[in-house]
Amino acid sequence: MPSAIGIDLGTTYSCVGVFQHGKVEIIANDQGNRTTPSYVAFSDTERLIGDAAKNQVAMNPTNTVFDAKRLIGRKFDDPKIQADMKHWPFTVVNDCGKPKIRVEFKGERKTFAPEEISSMVLTKMKETAEAYLGQSVKNAVITVPAYFNDSQRQATKDAGAIAGLNVMRIINEPTAAALAYGLDKNLKGERNVLIFDLGGGTFDVSILTIDEGSLFEVRATAGDTHLGGEDFDNRMVAHFVEEFKRKFKKDLSKNARALRRLRTACERAKRTLSSSTEATIEIDALMDGIDYYTKISRARFEELCSDLFRSTLQPVEKALSDAKMDKSSIHDIVLVGGSTRIPKVQSLLQNFFAGKSLNLSINPDEAVAYGAAVQAAILSGDKDDKIQDVLLVDVAPLSLGIETAGGVMTKLIERNSRIPCKQTKIFSTYADNQPGVSIQVFEGERAMTKDNNLLGQFDLSGIPPAPRGVPQIEVTFDLDANGILNVAAKDKSSGKEKNITIKNDKGRLSQADIDRMVSEAEKYREEDEKQREAIAARNQLEAYCFNLKQSLDGEGSSKLSEADRRTVQDRCDETLRWIDGNTMAEKEEYEHQMQELSRVCSPIMTKLHQQAAGGPQPTSCGQQAGGFGGRTGPTVEEVD
């Protein structure tokens, strides 16, 4: 049976795993890295995803897209998005209330939905798994922050569909990490585990009870879908922009490339400060030829981010009170996400739990993908001893309800209810002889619906005339295992019924949109493949030219006539000039040039080799001599 994979689709990095032969394999990408940057870059010639995209970001900041997870499932006027736009070098535009990303690609202006960018990252993860498994992959479990709302979950599912994946389940990141922890540690008895998951862009806290390492029951969840390592980077970048202004009277924030180089250096410095008390930043010619050398201490970094670090404790308190537990009843505190390596974050959490030691035993970058891979295996019916008894019980992160008279939020499903779940309540009309009711569905914790998030609405009409309060309208909320909601309303007297899956029409892609994006994704994939083939053909042609020219200076070349030497030299120079002037040529054009060059030069080189026979045979001129950027050649990384 084809393997099902688990994908941790992260804000800054993504990771993929598969469960086979009784264990989870975290799969390295084509660069040998077990996590892949969630970056997509568009240039005049090609589209790059992952490491290749992140490596060229300073050269092409306005067309390199990242942070799609901070856009997905949100509205353009969301204050969080408006604040983020100040930090992003790429352009975000308003398309009917939805945020879309605008880039220049192959000389044209293109607009992409966040789901499309995320789908490109998912495609990269899918291809990474396929290369490792040697077979095509269709089924996947994708993780989301526990605190993602309905529209963000739907949008993530859509991204999977655009990438050509059958998304078997959307599961919560801390729940996946708990699965990794529980299975890895062979836990005995009943343990209350707190998962503290602080990643690149999101923050979750979940409390689970794990029984005998097989029953995983989420008791409560809390978090902030907009807090993570990138926010700490932003603070450091702002600090150095101010310092640069003070020292050199120049404003870095107006220069996208300089700002990107500074951000890359800050990200590196932040990592250094997790193991050292001081980090050095050295950037040559940062702006207007100024070399910028500076230092930052761990204490200074902690001061810059002190309010953000402290804010991680509020969701911990909220989760404890929702789970009706006190601090002393938590057995294990498990750290997940790269940002939990920050010493101050660890010490604040440890002090909150009165000095209790934190559990650092699982890999914070890989735990979520590990758990997702286990869940994928369970859902595809894998009967391996290690996982056959595992049962996962998750909860709804936010309360769900409808608006009743006066704009009041009447909850049907309370937050932290077990999912899947179903709740029914009876409502009635507000006025005499009211012919219909409008059912407006909201999620959130506030008493009034205006302060909560509208998910969708529908009308139930055809109610027989009756005094107010007499008709009985039965409203049923059905929340599935992905945390996605179905709502039904039924008038008991007439039997009229209406239901919807909350598709959040304002924020959600239509099926037609998804179909269009799937075909576009296929087109981009074909273009990428053609581009790779063209580059390989160009490298081969270039290598052939250089090999020929080398042969003219090599041993025995003096035996060639001057006319032959001149012919080879001129044809090689002419071909190299053609390559320089035709960087966008197709594979066939390069192959044609290769044939022409070979037709003229091969007979001359054969003469040379025959005359030189007896000496060591030179290497064949046709083989690729490790070009730059070809599949076999080295990839070149920009260094600050």
UniProtKB/Swiss-Prot annotation:
CDD domains: ASKHA_NBD_HSP70_HSPA1 (cd10233). Pfam families: HSP70 (PF00012). The keyword ATP-binding applies. Signal peptide: none annotated. The keyword Nucleotide-binding applies. Keywords: ATP-binding, Nucleotide-binding, Stress response. Residues 608-640 are annotated as: Disordered. InterPro entries: ATPase_NBD, Heat_shock_70_CS, HSP70_C_sf, HSP70_peptide-bd_sf, Hsp_70_fam. Belongs to the heat shock protein 70 family. This is Heat shock protein 70 A1. It comes from Anopheles albimanus. The gene is HSP70A1.
